[in-house]
Curated annotation (Swiss-Prot):
Coiled-coil segments on the chain, per record: none
Function: This protein binds to 23S rRNA in the presence of protein L20.
Stated name of the protein: Large ribosomal subunit protein bL21
Listed Pfam families: Ribosomal_L21p
Keywords associated with the record: Ribonucleoprotein, Ribosomal protein, RNA-binding, rRNA-binding
Subunit description: Part of the 50S ribosomal subunit. Contacts protein L20.
Cellular component per GO, a single term: ribosome
Molecular function terms, GO-annotated: rRNA binding; structural constituent of ribosome
InterPro entries assigned to the protein according to its UniProt record, in alphabetical order: bL21-like (IPR028909), bL21-like_sf (IPR036164), Ribosomal_bL21 (IPR001787), Ribosomal_bL21_CS (IPR018258)
Name of encoding gene: rplU
Alphabetized HAMAP family for the sequence: Ribosomal_bL21
Origin species: Campylobacter hominis (strain ATCC BAA-381 / DSM 21671 / CCUG 45161 / LMG 19568 / NCTC 13146 / CH001A)
Family to which the UniProt record says this protein belongs: Belongs to the bacterial ribosomal protein bL21 family.
């Protein structure tokens, strides 16, 4: 059984027991979060919502919060001795899918 959920403008394909790194949101460690924005669900037969599947939800448990590896943005203009180096680390909330309710 799997579901396709929408969270903070992105879509994720999830199954029970999966670990996901979602964009950072305010939640306590070990807290339970329910997502009702389920775009599609497959439990033997595919149900596609318009835009969301009615009555479906995905229950998540917050595992921890953290930062991804650093991404380096480097810009250089040739022959001008002009360069710019900048780093970025995305903050995420790691969650575990505990159940999918159709």
């Amino acid at each position: 059984m799997y579901a396709i959920i929408k969270h903070s403008g992105k879509q994720y394909k999830v199954s029970e027991g999966d670990l996901l790194n979602l964009d950072h949101f305010a939640a306590e460690k070990k807290s339970i979060v329910e997502i009702t924005d389920v775009l599609a669900i497959n439990d033997g037969s595919l149900k596609v919502g318009a835009p969301f599947v009615e009555g479906a939800k995905v229950v998540l448990e917050v595992v921890n919060e953290g930062k991804d590896k650093k991404v380096v943005i480097f810009k250089k203009r040739r022959r001008k001795d002009s360069k710019q180096k900048r780093g970025f680390r995305r903050q995420y909330t790691r969650v575990k899918v505990t159940s999918i309710v159709a």
